[in-house]
């Protein structure tokens, strides 16, 4: 059967390539819903309700990707600050804002602080998972050695 691209058999990663995703979201029900969706796709997921707990965990080990809400508990802009702190630690860490805030100013601010994407919570779970798969696919492609680095040898002639 031809797949629609959204079936479970279309998962691009094997268990040997499991990625760690951190979700920083102060609303437990929302955090748990996203965590369950990511876990169904084979990702290892950790959730944090606030910036302080996330930073404490990230001091030990950075995840492979972070999903952050802009407003965190008593910090209306705590997600922005977390993004700034994470970007200072790693230029390559994929960061996605997933928030109810949908103004252009919010999105531009998040992207300028270093986020790779700025999405609103009305986005469907399949769409969100597809965005995450695409981000990891691009990262993997950038990490693969370029085909131009191959050496071609014919007799005494070597082309590199």
Language-model-detected regions and their locations in the chain:
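Short hydrophobic/Thr-rich beta-strand motif most characteristic of the beta2 strand and flanking loop
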Residues: 42-51, 57
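Charged docking surfaces used in two-component/phosphorelay signaling
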Residues: 32-40
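Conserved acidic carboxylate
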Residues: 25
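Active-site beta3 strand of CheY-like receiver
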Residues: 61-72
């Amino acid at each position: 059967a031809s797949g629609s691209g959204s079936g479970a058999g279309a998962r691009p990663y094997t268990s040997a390539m499991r990625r760690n995703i951190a979700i920083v979201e102060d609303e437990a029900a929302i955090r748990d819903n996203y965590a369950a969706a990511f876990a169904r796709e084979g990702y290892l997921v950790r959730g944090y309700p606030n910036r302080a707990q996330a930073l404490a965990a990230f001091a030990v080990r950075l995840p492979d990707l972070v999903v952050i809400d802009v407003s965190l508990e008593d910090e209306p802009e705590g997600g922005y600050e977390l993004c700034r702190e994470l970007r200072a630690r790693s230029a390559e860490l994929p960061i996605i804002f997933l928030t109810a805030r949908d103004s252009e100013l919010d999105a531009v601010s998040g992207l300028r602080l270093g986020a790779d994407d700025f999405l609103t919570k009305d986005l469907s779970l399949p769409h969100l998972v597809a965005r995450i798969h695409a981000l990891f696919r691009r990262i993997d492609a950038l990490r693969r050695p370029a085909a131009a680095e191959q050496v071609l040898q014919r007799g005494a002639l070597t082309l590199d």
